[in-house]
């Protein structure tokens, strides 16, 4: 069971790319007064900390098949991001089983 993730949740970072945040695109469902994340929500682009200092973005790719928010899959802690990163933060009060 993982927590439901919300706007500005941090990611874990991957390889030489540091952690960044995920940006909510929907504004109808909230946890703790903060918009929850759904499939396709973008990360703030992040830049490698070593040469060639490439910058890339990515979008959330939720694993749940049971929980939907505004018609899209809900994002939870440990869900992958298309660039290889992972969602690393979530609500401590709302969980997806």
Curated annotation (Swiss-Prot):
Annotated keywords: Iron, Metal-binding, Virion
Cofactors that this protein relies on: Fe cation
InterPro entries: PAAR_motif (IPR008727)
Cysteine disulfide partners in this protein: none
Pfam families the UniProt entry points to: PAAR_motif
Single GO term (MF): lysozyme activity
GO-annotated cellular components: virus tail, baseplate
KW Metal-binding (keyword) present: yes
Record-listed Fe cation binding positions: 14, 46, 56, 83
Chain ranges passing through the membrane: none
Localization per Swiss-Prot or TrEMBL: Virion
Tree of life domain: Viruses
Subunit comment: Heteromultimer with gp27 trimer and gp5 trimer; this interaction forms the tail lysozyme complex that creates an extension of the tail tube. Part of the baseplate macromolecular complex which consists of gp5, gp5.4, gp27 (central spike complex); gp6, gp25, gp53 (inner baseplate); gp7, gp8 (intermediate baseplate); gp9, gp10, gp11, gp12 (peripheral); gp48 and gp54 (proximal region of the tail tube).
Physiological role: Baseplate central spike complex-associated protein. Makes the tip of the central spike which probably punctures the host outer membrane, a necessary step for viral DNA ejection into the host cell.
Descriptive protein name: Baseplate puncturing device gp5.4
